[in-house]
Structure formats: C-alpha cells, structure tokens
Amino acid sequence: MEIDVSSFKKIASILYATTLLAGVMTASFAQAQDEALKGDGKELVMFTITASNVYGANQIKGAQAEADRLGYKLQVFQNNFSQPEQDQQVQQYIASGAKPAAVIFWPWVADAAINDVRQLARLAPVVQLTQEPNEQSWPFVQAYSGANQILIGETLGHTLIKARDAAKAAGKIFKSEGGNLLIFQHPEGEKTGTERLKGFEAVTKDAPFNIIHLEYGANSPESGYEIGSQVIPKYKDQIDFLFISNQQAANGIIRALKENGLTPGKDVYLVSGDCSGSLEAVKNGETFGTGIQPAAVEGALAIRTAAKLVKHGKVEGDIVQMEVSAEAPPIEDTPPAKFNYMPHAPAIGADGVANTKIWG
C-alpha cells in the first residue's frame, strides 16, 4: 500500500493552524472579557486584616495585582484583628469624603460590624469578603466573595476521617471509640470558625469524633504556641486528633505538642483548616493534611466580583463555586452571583501540596 506523505503533511498543517487559531480566539475572547470590565482609574476600597499576618499579606497582594490589571485604584485599610480599630478606619474613610466605585469589606467580628457596613453601603455597593454576611448585614451587602467556609469545614472533616483511618492502619489505639478530638478554633465571634465547624460536624455525624475541648483564639504561629502551651498540658493524655483553625496556628501548636512530649503524626494526628503559613509541617507529615486556600486568589476574586458589580450594577443567581484550576480562568462579563466562592481543595502530605495548584 502506497502512503501519500504529502496528504498527511497537509492534514497536519491544517490541524496545527486550526489549533493555533482556536488558541488565538480563546486568548482574544479572554482579553475582550477583561477589557469590558476595565476600571479606567475608578477607586475601590478594601477593609481587611493586617499584612503582618501572612494570610492578610497574600490577600492584599492578590487584590492589588488584580486591581492593577483591571485598571482600578485600590486603597487598603488593615486592622490588627480588632473590630474597634476597623470601626475607626471606616469612620475616618467616610469623613474623608471619598467616593469609591465599590467597597470590599472583611468585618473582623461580623455581628459587631453592622453599623460599619450600613454606613459604607451609603457610599457604594458593598462586597463582603471572607466572612459571609448575616441576616442583619445582607440588606447593606450586594454580594459575598471569598472562601466557602462550610466547604472548608467539610474538607477538614473528610481529611480528619482519612487521618483516623491512617492512624488505625498504623496500629494506634484510640482513647474513645471514634477518637478524642481537641479543637483549636478561630477567635470567638469570628464567623469563619463557626461555619467551618458546621461543615465538619455535617460530614462526621455518622462516625463522630469525641470532642474533648474547644479552645478559641489560635490564628497565628504565636497565638497557636501561646494558647497551645496552656491547653495541651491539661489534655495531653487524652488527645488522639487535633482540628486546628489554619496552618499558621498549627505550626505554633506543633511546637507546644513537642514540648509536652507528643510527636505529631505518631502520638497525635493534626489537620488544619487552610494552608496559610509555612507548609513544611504538611510536607514532613507532622500535619496530616490541610486545605489549599490561597489568600491571593481570595483577594483577586474580590476585585473581580467588585468589577462585575460596578459594570452591571446588580447580582444575578445565588451561587458560583469556582472550580479548582491551575491557572486563573478568564473573567466572564456578567453580573456577580450573590455568593462567589473561591476554589478549595484538600492536600495530604508532600505530594498533595506539590500537586494541588490553584490559579498559579
């Protein structure tokens, strides 16, 4: 059988040209979508936590990069985990006479920040960040953008179940039927922790852990170590598993565990809610697993949500849950949903950290 090589070359050339054209068209479409949402120098204002915290720093960095890309000027106010400080910042900003195109607002204590969001809503549409609005604040908030805290809690629960299975396989004898669980929660009153605990309880209800204590306040390596040093000595003979607010806090608690004679990953198994902070302990097995929640992605998504709101002046639909993808997807030139959730994925061990990429 004689093969016409020239025909194959022609077909290959056509396929290559078609693929190249599709790529160019996709890139052009994405660029057109971005152009449609350009800010043209309009101002956005963002109220969030301090950049001295690694999560706050990365969230601000992601927001600033996306604002620059879309042509918005971004002014950022940082509070040091203090609602009174944030209240003062809001009052000063309002008194300045500023007229932003939109407000991005992370209330430190949601229930105590109702007056802030009420007054900010008189200036511009409000996008609430990280902590979902409650019934009192929804009349003044147009959209939520950020982490899906229930999903994070569910992911934490599923990962703790895997940790329990791994502990059983390693021959660990539990101190109660389902294993004793010590919880280090976010600061009391922060809705982030409340929602995550709801998600955790929902996915573990059929095979529950025995919660021996819940301690509020661990949210950084320093507070994790300080609080852990006080709590762990009281419960060190009772602990099988630890549920920890985030990896920053876990890194401090690991230090406290070691100082009290407990080896993480052997005597006790830890799971953290999100990946803020150094992930070395996840890679070396001292933390069994965490959730990949890049703060920079949360900041970028908040800017995208605000840009959509500025362009269209309304929300459309209830929920958009962003899928996990290695690269940031193009922005759709549509109104934002009421709830705009960033991607989230579990990561167990070094391979989990290495192989889970979200928006770069």
Specify the residue positions occupied by each region the protein language model found.
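Hinge/beta->alpha junction and helix N-cap segments in small-molecule ligand-binding domains
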Residues: 46-61, 75-88, 109, 130-131, ...
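Flexible loop/hinge segments that line or gate small-molecule binding clefts
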Residues: 116-151, 162, 167, 173-180, ...
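Short, low-complexity disordered leader/linker segments with a strong preference
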Residues: 1-43, 68-69, 98, 118-123, ...
